[in-house]
């Protein structure tokens, strides 16, 4: 089985766009630094093509044995594809045991099929940084040294004192003050004498936030509990029947409380203002002989008041 059977065909469309974007992030300068670092530690030559020189996994496994002896016990030097892929898998496992972060690792096909050489470059740079953090000295300054943990132990008194400190993320309270604030639980006044605002005369004063009552008046309003008349004779309302609704519902200029008795039930009409009609209206004008008993009893009750 030849290695060409593992190679992919040309990419088109979105796949080609993604591949080109990954290739654009590849740094040739970092490749030269990695080449010098790997060849300096292993003593092996990678060759002119960086990908083809590392795809068999022999140089990478040798590099891991230099960084951590015995991490790759067996290195396959066969030209078979599965042996080369096995070397790459052993190298990735050795990087995990060396302390590499999973996000910094690459897959075997990324290097073997040249699928994502940018990720391979990132992984090797992270490996160089991890080796520098562990104190490896090499002639090539490559990789970033990781910072070490700086743990601090505080006693209980210090931890409790820190709970009273306002963090800088919350702002500052240097200029904060409660000067002039009323004590908690006291009444809140609607005026301030320092601002030359007139104090309210009594508890019935309506503040400006509620509007104004300068034009409000209760002139002509009936007392609570009294009877409501359907019409008002002073306004010239026609006396059609006992179910007619007059303008009293929206107009009170001519209303008065003369002749009203408080505490009585509310009647639909008042016989003093709603007579039974005249002879001209088609009704017989009598002296009350033909009235209904209920109406006569009501008239006697009204006359008693």
From Swiss-Prot:
The modification N6-acetyllysine is found at residues 8, 25. Keywords: Acetylation, Actin-binding, Calmodulin-binding, Phosphoprotein, Repeat. Pfam families: Calponin (PF00402), CH (PF00307). Calponin-like repeats lie at residues 166-191, 206-231, 245-269. One of its GO terms (molecular function) is actin binding. It comes from the Eukaryota. The keyword Phosphoprotein applies. The keyword Repeat applies. Smooth muscle, and tissues containing significant amounts of smooth muscle. One of its GO terms (cellular component) is stress fiber. GO terms for biological process: actomyosin structure organization; cellular response to mechanical stimulus; establishment of localization in cell; hemopoiesis; macrophage migration; negative regulation of macrophage migration; negative regulation of phagocytosis; phagocytosis. InterPro entries: Calponin-like, Calponin/LIMCH1, Calponin_repeat, CH_dom, CH_dom_sf, SM22_calponin. The modification Phosphoserine is found at residue 138. The modification N-acetylserine is found at residue 2. Residues 28-132 form the Calponin-homology (CH) domain. Belongs to the calponin family. Thin filament-associated protein that is implicated in the regulation and modulation of smooth muscle contraction. It is capable of binding to actin, calmodulin and tropomyosin. The interaction of calponin with actin inhibits the actomyosin Mg-ATPase activity. This is Calponin-2.
């Amino acid at each position: 089985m030849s290695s060409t059977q593992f190679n992919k065909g040309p990419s088109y469309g979105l796949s080609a766009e993604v591949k080109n974007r990954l290739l654009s992030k590849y740094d040739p300068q970092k490749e030269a630094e990695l080449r010098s670092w790997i060849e300096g530690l292993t003593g092996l030559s990678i060759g002119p093509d960086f990908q083809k020189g590392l795809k068999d996994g022999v140089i990478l496994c040798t590099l891991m044995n230099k960084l951590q002896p015995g991490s790759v016990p067996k290195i396959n030097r066969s030209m078979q594809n599965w042996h080369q892929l096995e070397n790459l898998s052993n190298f990735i496992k050795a990087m995990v045991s060396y302390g590499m972060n999973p996000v910094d690792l690459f897959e075997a096909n990324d290097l073997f099929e040249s699928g994502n050489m940018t990720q391979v470059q990132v992984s090797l740079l992270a490996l160089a940084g991890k080796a520098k953090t562990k104190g490896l000295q090499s002639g090539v300054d490559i990789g970033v040294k990781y910072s070490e943990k700086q743990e601090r132990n505080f006693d209980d008194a210090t931890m409790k004192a820190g709970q009273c400190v306002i963090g800088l993320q919350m702002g500052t309270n240097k200029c904060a003050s409660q000067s002039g604030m009323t004590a908690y639980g006291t009444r809140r006044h609607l005026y301030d004498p320092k601002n030359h605002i007139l104090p309210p005369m009594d508890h019935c004063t309506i503040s400006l936030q509620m509007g104004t009552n300068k034009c409000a008046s209760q002139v002509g309003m009936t007392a609570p509990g009294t009877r409501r008349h359907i019409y008002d004779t002073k306004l010239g309302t026609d006396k059609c029947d006992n179910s007619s609704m007059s303008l009293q519902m929206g107009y009170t200029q001519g209303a008065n409380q003369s002749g009203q008795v408080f505490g009585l039930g509310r009647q639909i009409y008042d016989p003093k203002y709603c007579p039974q009609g005249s002879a001209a209206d088609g009704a017989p004008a009598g002296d009350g002989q033909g009235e209904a008993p209920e109406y006569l009893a009501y008239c006697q009750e009204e006359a008693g008041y």
